[in-house]
């Protein structure tokens, strides 16, 4: 769409003649150009912002020769599209069949409300999850500490002390039994020796008896 076509469409929408539509378009463009030239910005809510941007000095290259060329600092006109304009072009917002395509304070306010509500809900949910998980972790860390500090080592220590005592008493009993057995073994040969000695004396009596008979 060029300027002439724009004027034709504007003439139909306004229901006026072509001269008035042409004057309206030219006055709008003239006002924007003069404001941006001064350094001001022209904001049309929902549509966009016309502004001036400052570019610093830089080094560029000539595309034909390839030589480096120094570019002086300059000012460049720029246009930033508005939120509603972007939404309509991207398809996020429906374009109405009749009436203005961009309304003042409709798309922008709705977008801001959605942006504010969504992070708030996520933050509250994250805070609740953190609050519920934190005590559980503390309890999990405390419970093993108590068990390890009081019950488990005490039982093991008692068992460790009792079992050697039993083993020692058993060992003492075994040694006592062995000692008594050894004493009995040493005493038994003495009796045998005592029994054998009278056996040697018996033949002497027999000899004396034989002598008396003779």
From Swiss-Prot:
Changing residue 55 to E/Q: Loss of DNA-binding, decreased in vitro phosphorylation of N-terminal HupB fragment. Gene3D superfamilies: IHF-like DNA-binding proteins (4.10.520.10). GO terms for biological process: chromosome condensation; intracellular iron ion homeostasis. Induction: Transcribed in early log phase, decreases in mid-log, and rises into late-log and early stationary phase. Protein levels rise as cells enter stationary phase (at protein level). It catalyses: 4 Fe(2+) + O2 + 4 H(+) = 4 Fe(3+) + 2 H2O. It is found in: Cytoplasm, Nucleoid. Its EC number is 1.16.3.1. Changing residue 65 to A: Loss of DNA-binding, no change in phosphorylation of N-terminal HupB fragment. Its main location: cytoplasm. Residues 100-214 are annotated as: Disordered. Residues 102-112 have a biased composition (Low complexity). The modification N6-succinyllysine is found at residues 3, 113, 142. Phosphorylated in vivo on Ser and Thr-residues; the protein is degraded during purification so most sites were not identified, but at least one of Thr-43 and/or Thr-45 are modified in vivo. In vitro at least PknE, PknF and PknB phosphorylate HupB; PknE is the most active and phosphorylates many sites in vitro including Thr-43 and Thr-45. It holds the Pfam family Bac_DNA_binding. The N-terminus (residues 1-108) is stable, binds DNA and is phosphorylated in vitro by PknE, PknF and PknB. This fragment binds DNA less well when phosphorylated by PknE. Residues 1-100 stimulate Top1 and physically interact with it. The N-terminus (residues 1-40) forms an intertwined dimer, while residues 44-83 form a beta-saddle which probably contacts DNA. Oligomerizes. Homodimer; the crystallized protein is missing the C-terminal 105 residues. Interacts with topoisomerase 1 (topA). Interacts with Eis. Interacts with NAD-dependent protein deacylase NPD (MRA_1161). Interacts with MRA_0812 CoA transferase. This is DNA-binding protein HupB.
């Amino acid at each position: 769409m060029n300027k002439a076509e724009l004027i034709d469409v504007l003439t139909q929408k306004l229901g006026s003649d072509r001269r008035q539509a042409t004057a309206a378009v030219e006055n709008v463009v003239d006002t924007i150009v003069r404001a941006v030239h001064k350094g001001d910005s022209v904001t049309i809510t929902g549509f966009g912002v016309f502004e001036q941007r400052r570019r610093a000095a830089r080094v560029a290259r000539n595309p034909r020769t390839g030589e480096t060329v120094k570019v002086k600092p300059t000012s460049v006109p720029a246009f930033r599209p508005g939120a509603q304009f972007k939404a309509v072009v991207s398809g996020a917002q429906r374009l109405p069949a009749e009436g203005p395509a961009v309304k003042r304070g409709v798309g922008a306010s709705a977008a801001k409300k959605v942006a504010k509500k969504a992070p708030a809900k996520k933050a509250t949910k994250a805070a609740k999850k953190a609050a519920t998980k934190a005590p559980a972790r503390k309890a999990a860390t405390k419970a093993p500490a108590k068990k390890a500090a009081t019950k488990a080592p005490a039982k093991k220590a008692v068992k460790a002390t009792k079992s050697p005592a039993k083993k020692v008493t058993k060992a003492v009993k075994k040694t006592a039994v062995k000692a008594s057995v050894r004493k009995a073994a040493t005493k038994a040969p003495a009796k045998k020796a005592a029994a054998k000695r009278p056996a040697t004396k018996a033949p002497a009596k027999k000899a004396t008896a034989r002598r008396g008979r003779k």
